[in-house]
Amino acid sequence: MIEILKDKRGSSPIFTAIIVLVFSLIISTVMYIAYVEIQTTVIRNAMKTGLANLAYTISEDTYTALRESDFEEYVAKLTGESAYRTKLENTYKGDIANSIDTSTSEYTVDSIRLSFTRDGMKIRYTCTCDVTFYVRLFGINMPATAKSVQVEGSHTAKYG
């Protein structure tokens, strides 16, 4: 192989072209993986921002619920299916949509979900979404990879 590369007569243009092509593909793959990681970080940061806004709303509502002595009812409303929970989910989805584009030609953010759990006087919330990345091949956007992004938060309801 080294003899072919040292050949001065020009008899190795196909071999050289293949090597250049392989290196180009490797560089393209590395750049695409870096792009996916960067975009995933951007989406995760947008989710964290939305989560901070959501945490403020939940904290404020928890304080009100504790003052009115119906914390158990509030937790049941938060962890079960209710209009209040739907309102929180829609607010969260709106915060994410205001921070980033949820659908572009490079990726789509789907299935934004919120789940709430109670651990003593602590309310935990988990936000999850699925991100599908696309590659344009021959004029058609093809799904290349899918990632699940998850962000968690909590606050302790100690206002006593």
Residue map of PLM features:
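Alpha-helical assembly-interface signal, strongest on the long, hydrophobic N-terminal helix that forms
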Residues: 2-83
